[in-house]
Amino acid sequence: MESKRVDVLVGLMLIMAIFGVHSVTAHLPPGICIDHCMKECKLSGIGVVACIKYCPVHCLPPDSSSKEHFCNLGCMLDKCAKFNDDEKKMSDCVFDCRKFHCKINTD
């Protein structure tokens, strides 16, 4: 099972490289990176569901132990996947996940 996930991820990365989705986006702040990645991914002809799975993993900082990381990823997969045919609604949903739903206090 784990091998299949690795194969899928490697396949997505290869498709992204072939169609010009640049790894430079990983150096942007996560919110901007995800928005940019989603646009580039969809323009490349890759399915929106695959983009939703790829972009948060590609763009979020390496510290995946944070609650915010898992909240953003879960929120996007749970709430935003249904907007796969509407880029505006998808972008708004991703923004809402980051700014409102997953705003975790560290106090």
Curated annotation (Swiss-Prot):
Stamen. The keyword Signal applies. InterPro entries: THNL. The keyword Disulfide bond does not apply. Keywords: Signal. Residues 1-23 form the signal peptide. This is Protein TAP1. It comes from Antirrhinum majus. The lineage of its organism: Eukaryota, Viridiplantae, Streptophyta, Embryophyta, Tracheophyta.
